[in-house]
């Protein structure tokens, strides 16, 4: 058996739906996933809403799919190495509208950290996502795929510069997550000097070196009233810009939020990811030579992934065995003389069983079925049902 075969990916991306439709899907996917006990990882950006699971029962897959309503029939399901390949390609920027963009890697890391802390992304699925992040970093280090505009934020700034002189414009960025922070830095590089950031936490945006306002309905209204360009990059399921005040100064709103940060029908130009497709295509054509190099790295890492999963699997199983043996050792140590004897007993268990664990890792790398057989014998011998 190959452990990567347990991976399942459910995806809707910019290739299947427009940004507005993707925006509607994200809330439903999160809603059905939060109640699941299955290890899972959800990634939603401007360009994608994806759920990754490991060894899920068929009914769990169907539950997650239901969250994609009303676009369930468009969901792309991948399994095993195809699912891992897709995640690696996403991390590498190969599946982005702007090939090689860096925003997606930051969003992937943020989502991973958040979901690991919450206990959703765990066990072997955690290993897969960790490896994807490594692949994304390696591709950008070893290839030139990210030269030029580094993300959709960069593209949006280029788009705005064709219409407005940023050196004289008043610019507001709402949101200081990975996308918002990137926008601020690139706007400064592009010549924007009259720049304000609006964020839920003023402290978290203080290091950006610009004026920061706390996020509120009034601060958003002030941005629209007093600024020429407003960028939004806030993680929220409700629009933060629902209307534009009469006689507002704003000329362009750039909505980088996922889901959408702006309501439909605003009386000013709203730039979304869909607005940037033609510009992205131009730069993608310039990156063709680097795509093959990036794809070769992805394939190398897929081979390494199975080996890593086998080692991690042995470590997880061994941890449960060690816990069982430690418990016995501590009980015997307690009988023999208290704390010092307990510590000595634990140390003896570690020293005695470490060679067994290392041997199991070697066996698993070369023959996972044999490793599983050995562990099954241990499980039956000690009456451990949850190995």
Curated annotation (Swiss-Prot):
This is Glutamyl-tRNA reductase 1. Pathway: Porphyrin-containing compound metabolism; protoporphyrin-IX biosynthesis; 5-aminolevulinate from L-glutamyl-tRNA(Glu): step 1/2. Belongs to the glutamyl-tRNA reductase family. GO terms for biological process: protoporphyrinogen IX biosynthetic process from glutamate. It holds the Pfam family Shikimate_DH. Possesses an unusual extended V-shaped dimeric structure with each monomer consisting of three distinct domains arranged along a curved 'spinal' alpha-helix. The N-terminal catalytic domain specifically recognizes the glutamate moiety of the substrate. The second domain is the NADPH-binding domain, and the third C-terminal domain is responsible for dimerization. Substrate binds at residues 45-48, 96, 101-103, 107. One of its GO terms (molecular function) is NADP binding. Its EC number is 1.2.1.70. PROSITE patterns: GLUTR (PS00747). NADP(+) binds at residues 175-180. Keywords: NADP, Oxidoreductase, Porphyrin biosynthesis. Catalyzes the NADPH-dependent reduction of glutamyl-tRNA(Glu) to glutamate 1-semialdehyde (GSA). InterPro entries: 4pyrrol_synth_GluRdtase, 4pyrrol_synth_GluRdtase_N, GluRdtase_CS, GluRdtase_N_sf, NAD(P)-bd_dom_sf, Shikm_DH/Glu-tRNA_Rdtase. During catalysis, the active site Cys acts as a nucleophile attacking the alpha-carbonyl group of tRNA-bound glutamate with the formation of a thioester intermediate between enzyme and glutamate, and the concomitant release of tRNA(Glu). The thioester intermediate is finally reduced by direct hydride transfer from NADPH, to form the product GSA. The active site is at 46 (nucleophile). The record marks 86 as: Important for activity. Coiled coil: none annotated. It is an enzyme of class 1 (oxidoreductase).
